[in-house]
């Protein structure tokens, strides 16, 4: 029953959005430059917000109207429009953000609408953008995973209710994707996927931004660090199995897990069952993540899927070597033998061996760490990406 409901909801939503786009594209085109962008999305933490919204605001294009659940950080030229609780209760959070985004078209007409993740934010951006004669941008937050099989494998309550791939929803998702004036992907894997499925409009690879000018600790006293949500999506259970394997070779090995989530209690139990209480520390949510990253020798992710992890980029900027799953676009930055390692997600022994070898070879680790930082500084520095966004937005509007 859940699969049927999800299929109906997604199919009707995508079909309606495509119809609106086809009927209004070009017909309601605005010729007046308004110097304003409307962004719709959900931002789970300040790091994600600054990685993606701050470069938009700093691009110099103009005012940014952010329709989201709650204010996160104050920035010049950033205006929050957050639906009140009564609207969330009546329409749902996604529905309320749709109506608030629509209302902005009258209150603050914009040149460009941007949505993160195809459902529901990018759908909202497409419908509202087309109705008000604006350009529309789709940011593939989770890469091709949010399109493959209709997005059944992503962290989204409606899409995950599909429970298995849906050819119908996937076909509609691909057709919907082709309606956007610009698609933003995080790396080469997602770019190739979008091109294979006949996207012919503007396409850009833009990662999240990181602050590369923060102080870096001289003391690397954390052997391994994980930063992320403690949920099945990130597979921290797999990470703990790896930690147990490393601890058999390096008795005083220390792993630090930063973040919280629904799986924390189960993970703490797993630590006890594996007998690695002395090797693992759960820190929960922290405000000093950059400081912790700067103290880490290795940054490890055993996720079953990622786009490009912001935490990984931040760790690389702090001269921490990434050892991550070879999923999504992580390998664009974790380049084997040059800046880190991308390992098959199921290869537990590969993770264990690589981590043990890196912790035992300081010279090799230093070489990788220096290269990792250089790559991130060149491609992901916040100032550089602000300029990149300025060029992209102006080209799109012109």
Q: Language-model segments: which ranges?
A:
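Membrane-proximal helix-turn-helix segments that form the acceptor-binding/catalytic region
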Residues: 131, 162-182
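Short hydrophobic beta-strand element within catalytic cores of glycosyltransferases
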Residues: 321-324, 334
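A short, well-ordered alpha-helix in the C-terminal region of glycosyltransferases
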Residues: 350, 357, 364-379, 385-391
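A conserved nucleotide-sugar
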Residues: 225-228, 236-282, 360-364, 398
């Amino acid at each position: 029953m859940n699969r049927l409901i999800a299929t109906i909801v997604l199919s009707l939503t995508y079909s309606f959005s495509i119809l609106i786009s086809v009927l209004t594209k070009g017909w309601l085109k605005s010729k007046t430059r308004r110097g304003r962008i409307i962004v719709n999305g959900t931002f789970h933490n300040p790091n994600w917000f600054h990685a993606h919204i701050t470069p938009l605001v700093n691009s110099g294009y103009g005012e940014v109207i952010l329709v989201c659940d709650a204010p996160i950080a104050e920035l010049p030229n950033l205006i929050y429009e957050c639906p009140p609780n009564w609207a969330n209760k009546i329409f749902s959070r996604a529905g309320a953000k749709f109506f608030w985004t629509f209302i902005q078209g009258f209150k603050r007409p914009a040149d460009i609408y941007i949505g993160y993740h195809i459902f529901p934010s990018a759908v909202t951006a497409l419908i509202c953008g087309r109705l008000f004669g604006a350009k529309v941008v789709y940011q593939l937050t989770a890469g091709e995973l949010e399109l493959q099989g209709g997005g059944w494998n992503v962290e989204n309550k409606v899409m995950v209710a599909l429970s298995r791939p849906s050819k119908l929803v996937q076909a509609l998702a691909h057709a919907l994707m082709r309606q956007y004036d610009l698609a933003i992907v995080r790396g080469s894997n997602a770019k190739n996927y979008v091109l294979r499925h006949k996207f012919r409009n503007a396409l850009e690879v833009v990662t999240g931004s990181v602050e590369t000018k923060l102080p870096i600790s001289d003391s690397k006293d954390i052997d391994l660090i994980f930063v992320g949500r403690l949920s099945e999506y990130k597979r921290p259970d797999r990470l703990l199995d790896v930690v147990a394997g490393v601890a058999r070779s390096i008795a005083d090995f220390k792993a630090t897990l930063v973040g919280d989530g629904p799986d924390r209690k189960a993970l703490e139990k797993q630590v006890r069952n594996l007998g690695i209480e002395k090797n693992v520390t759960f820190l929960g949510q922290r405000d000093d993540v950059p400081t912790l990253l700067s103290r880490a020798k290795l940054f490890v992710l055993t996720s079953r899927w990622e786009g490009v992890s912001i935490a990984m980029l931040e760790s690389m900027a702090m001269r921490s070597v990434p050892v991550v799953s070879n999923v999504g676009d992580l390998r664009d930055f974790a380049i084997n033998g040059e800046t880190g390692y991308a390992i098959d997600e199921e290869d537990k022994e590969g993770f264990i061996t690589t981590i043990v070898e890196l912790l035992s070879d300081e010279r090799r680790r230093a070489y990788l760490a220096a290269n990792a930082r250089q790559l991130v500084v060149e491609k992901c520095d916040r100032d550089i990406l602000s300029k990149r966004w300025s060029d992209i937005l102006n080209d799109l509007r012109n």
